[in-house]
C-alpha cells in the first residue's frame, strides 16, 4: 500500500465536448484540491487542475496541455487523483487518513478474535464503510461508525470492532441529506 500518496479526488464523467470533466474532490473544501500541488494518478502521470465551475474542471498534463476533447475526457473517467502526503497537514492525535487503515488487523472487541484486515475503505456518499477480509476470513463490510468501531488507534495499530446484530439506516437517502447509521446489539 502506497502511504506516501493520499487519494484526494476522482475524475467523473466528461462535461461538454472541450475536454472538461467533473471531479469529485475529497478535500473538506472541494476547491482546495488545487492547493496541494501536483496531482498524480494511479499510473504515475502528473496532472494539474483548474476549476471551471461547480465540480467541473480542466485537467492539464505535466506539459501543461489540457485534455483534447470529449474522447480524452471519457478516457479519464474513474481516474484517481492523489497528492503527496507531505503536501497535507499531519493529522492531529486521534485523527488519521483513511489510507492509514488499509492493511490494519481488526479484532472483535471483548474477545480479541481476529475479524480480518481492512481491505478497502468505501465512501459512496451515504457514509463510510470498511471492507474486512483476508486469508481465512469471509468478506465483511461494516459501517465506519463509533458503534461498530469503538477503538481505532492507528499509532498502536489497533482496531476493535463490535459486530452488530442489525444495522439500521435512518434518514432520506434520495437527496444526500443527513443519514444516520446505527448498529444494535452485537456479538461479544
UniProtKB/Swiss-Prot annotation:
Major place of localization?
cytoplasm
Q: Which organism is it from?
A: Gluconacetobacter diazotrophicus (strain ATCC 49037 / DSM 5601 / CCUG 37298 / CIP 103539 / LMG 7603 / PAl5)
What is the protein named? Ribosome maturation factor RimM
> What's its job?
An accessory protein needed during the final step in the assembly of 30S ribosomal subunit, possibly for assembly of the head region. Essential for efficient processing of 16S rRNA. May be needed both before and after RbfA during the maturation of 16S rRNA. It has affinity for free ribosomal 30S subunits but not for 70S ribosomes.
* UniProt entry tagged with the keyword Membrane: no
* Family designation: Belongs to the RimM family.
User: Per the record, GO CC terms?
Assistant: cytoplasm; ribosome
Q: Which gene encodes it?
A: rimM
Q: Which Pfam families does this UniProt record tie to the protein?
A: PRC_RimM, RimM
Per its UniProt entry, which superkingdom is the organism in? Bacteria
Domain PRC barrel positions: 93-175
One Gene Ontology term from the biological process aspect of the record: rRNA processing
* SUPFAM superfamilies on file: PRC-barrel domain, Translation proteins
Q: Which NCBIfam families does the record match to this protein?
A: 16S_RimM
Cite the record's note on assembly. Answer: Binds ribosomal protein uS19.
Key words, A-Z: Chaperone, Cytoplasm, Ribosome biogenesis, rRNA processing
Q: What is known of its domains?
A: The PRC barrel domain binds ribosomal protein uS19.
What are the subcellular locations of this protein? Cytoplasm
One Gene Ontology term of the molecular function aspect: ribosome binding
Q: Where is the signal peptide?
A: none
Amino acid at each position: 500500500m502506497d502511504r506516501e500518496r493520499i487519494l484526494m479526488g476522482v475524475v467523473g464523467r466528461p462535461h461538454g465536448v472541450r475536454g472538461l470533466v467533473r471531479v469529485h474532490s475529497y478535500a473538506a473544501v472541494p476547491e482546495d484540491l488545487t492547493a496541494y500541488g501536483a496531482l498524480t494518478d494511479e499510473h504515475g502521470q502528473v496532472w494539474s487542475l483548474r476549476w471551471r465551475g461547480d465540480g467541473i474542471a480542466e485537467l492539464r498534463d505535466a506539459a501543461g496541455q489540457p485534455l483534447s476533447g470529449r474522447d480524452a475526457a471519457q478516457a479519464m473517467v474513474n481516474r484517481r487523483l492523489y497528492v503527496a502526503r507531505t503536501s497535507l497537514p499531519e493529522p492531529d492525535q486521534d485523527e488519521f487518513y483513511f489510507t492509514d487503515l488499509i492493511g490494519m488487523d481488526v479484532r472483535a472487541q471483548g474477545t480479541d478474535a481476529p475479524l480480518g484486515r481492512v481491505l478497502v475503505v468505501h465512501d459512496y456518499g451515504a457514509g463510510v464503510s470498511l471492507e474486512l477480509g483476508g486469508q481465512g476470513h469471509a468478506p465483511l463490510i461494516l459501517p465506519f461508525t463509533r458503534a461498530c468501531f469503538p477503538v481505532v488507534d492507528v499509532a498502536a495499530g489497533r482496531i476493535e470492532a463490535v459486530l452488530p446484530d442489525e444495522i439500521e439506516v435512518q434518514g432520506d437517502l434520495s437527496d444526500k441529506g443527513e443519514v444516520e447509521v446505527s448498529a444494535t446489539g452485537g456479538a461479544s
